[in-house]
Swiss-Prot record:
It is an enzyme of class 4 (lyase). This is Argininosuccinate lyase. SUPFAM superfamilies: L-aspartase-like. HAMAP family: Arg_succ_lyase. Pathway: Amino-acid biosynthesis; L-arginine biosynthesis; L-arginine from L-ornithine and carbamoyl phosphate: step 3/3. The keyword Cytoplasm applies. Belongs to the lyase 1 family. Argininosuccinate lyase subfamily. The keyword Disulfide bond does not apply. GO terms for cellular component: cytosol.
Length: 457
């Protein structure tokens, strides 16, 4: 049953109907559409469109329909309704007869779909935050277990300074914490109710929109009807957050892929998140991480698509806006699946502590310590930087680490070097000296882990 038709003398062509109908994807808004309809029925009582008895009858029927939807949401797809609003109204009329036709009084599908998608987005934010927090907890637990795993830190994919695997884990805790807080910010901005805005100019019935907003779990009603039915900022914002978080996940996945490579051999991924080759029997491929990395472009594509859809739309509602749903549904599903998979990857991750330490001892990652040592002896940093650079070249030519050079060799480049240089060139010294807040010193990392455990408890 179409919710329009009196204006038309011919039925819609089947080709147009197939092109126009959205039930195949907006069926996912069934629960929210029913929830909004119950709220609207209560608002109509207060403006004398419905009696209390009629409202109770409608609410009972809608709750029955809600139970049916929750038991088998896919059954909706067997219907030929235009969209989820048409489907809900049709099923309601089947249950209560002509009374069901009164529910849409003063309401447009424009404000109806606007409230549906906001209700859905609010629910998804809560679910996504729990998944993100769970990933953070797993990262913190992994960090706690790997505080002694010294490894190279990298810039430009070149060994730079020693860090610990725990410090690496806690870096991603911080990234995902920003994603979590962005979701909170987005939730607060979208927590306004557009229902009662009508098609664009507001409803002709003196509905108490603030009371309606509170009934539906919103903080307050939107302030402008024209904006209310045109607004899809919350979708763009969630797609933006999802895209940025997927970029974080992709970096996590890329690090894991590199660490898992035969050349690095820092970690071993569980058999449960890897696959083999149909030709090469020795292969153990990091498919979970590669798929996380690959799906990032898919989510970013949804953001780009939505921005392009919105950029040229005049006020107020346009059918183009129907294109908001498939992108947001797919992007948030993909994001949550990737967050959960990253959590699973961490579950049985093995860190090769001996190998990470061996790698940290190579690559002259203690060169900065030598430069700081010279500074402590009164050498200006810019000069010490140049001196250490020359020393590294010499060590490379001799096939030695800095810690393996003799004092006479050091003094070819600076006379201030003494026997105390060897202590500061050790990996432990490199870590211990980074004791400012946020640094890699074991004390600071332990503090960060303890603080995060308390925060995420």
């Amino acid at each position: 049953m179409a919710l329009w038709g009196g204006r038309f003398t011919q039925a819609a062509d089947k080709r147009f109907k197939d092109f126009n109908d959205s039930l195949r994807f907006d069926y996912r808004l069934a629960e929210q559409d029913i929830q909004g309809s119950i709220g609207w029925s209560k608002a109509l009582v207060k403006v004398n469109v419905l009696t209390i008895e009629e409202q109770h009858q409608l609410e009972q029927a809608l709750n029955e329909l809600l139970v049916e939807v929750r038991s088998n949401p896919q059954a909706i797809l067997q219907d030929d309704a235009e969209d989820i609003h048409s489907w809900v109204e049709s099923k309601l009329i089947d249950k209560v007869g002509n009374l069901g036709k009164k529910l849409h009084t003063g309401r447009s599908r424009n404000d109806q779909v606007a409230v549906d998608i906001k209700l859905w987005c609010k629910q998804r934010v809560v679910e996504l935050q729990e998944s993100v927090r769970n990933l953070q907890r797993h990262l913190v637990q992994t960090a706690e277990n790997t505080q002694q795993a010294v490894m190279p830190g990298y810039t430009h994919l070149q060994r730079a300074q020693p860090i610990t695997f725990a410090h690496w884990c806690m870096a991603y805790v911080e990234m995902f914490d920003r994603d979590y807080s962005r979701l909170t910010d987005a939730y607060n901005r979208m927590n306004t109710c557009p229902l009662g805005s009508g098609a664009l100019a507001g409803t002709a019935y003196a509905v108490d929109r603030d009371s309606l907003a509170h009934d539906l779990g919103f903080a307050f009603a939107t302030r402008n009807s024209l904006d209310s039915v045109s607004d899809r900022d919350h979708i763009v914002e969630l797609l933006s957050i999802a895209s940025l978080s997927m970029a974080h996940l992709s970096r996590f996945a890329e690090d894991m892929i590199i660490f898992n490579s035969g050349e690095a051999n820092f970690v071993e991924l569980s058999d449960r998140v890897t696959s083999g080759s149909s030709l090469m029997p020795q292969k153990k491929n990091p498919d979970a991480c590669e798929l996380i990395r690959g799906k990032t472009g898919r989510v970013i594509g949804s953001l780009t698509s939505m921005l392009i859809t919105l950029k040229g739309l005049p006020l107020a509602y346009n059918k183009d806006m129907q294109e908001d749903k498939e992108g947001i549904f797919d992007a948030l599903d993909t994001w949550q699946n990737c967050v959960d998979m990253a959590t699973f990857v961490l579950d049985e991750l093995k860190v090769n502590v001996e190998r990470t330490r061996e790698a940290a001892l190579k690559g002259y990652s203690n060169a900065t310590e030598l430069a700081d040592y010279l500074v402590s002896k009164g050498v200006p940093f810019r000069d010490s930087h140049h001196i250490v650079g020359e020393t590294v070249v010499y060590a490379i030519e001799k096939g030695k680490g800095l810690e393996d050079l003799t004092i006479p060799e050091f003094r070819q480049f600076s006379e201030v070097v003494g026997d105390d240089v060897y202590e500061i060139l050790s990996l432990q010294s490199c870590l211990d000296k980074r004791c400012a807040k946020g640094g890699v010193s074991p004390l600071r990392v332990a503090e960060a882990i303890a603080e995060a455990k308390t925060r995420f408890a």
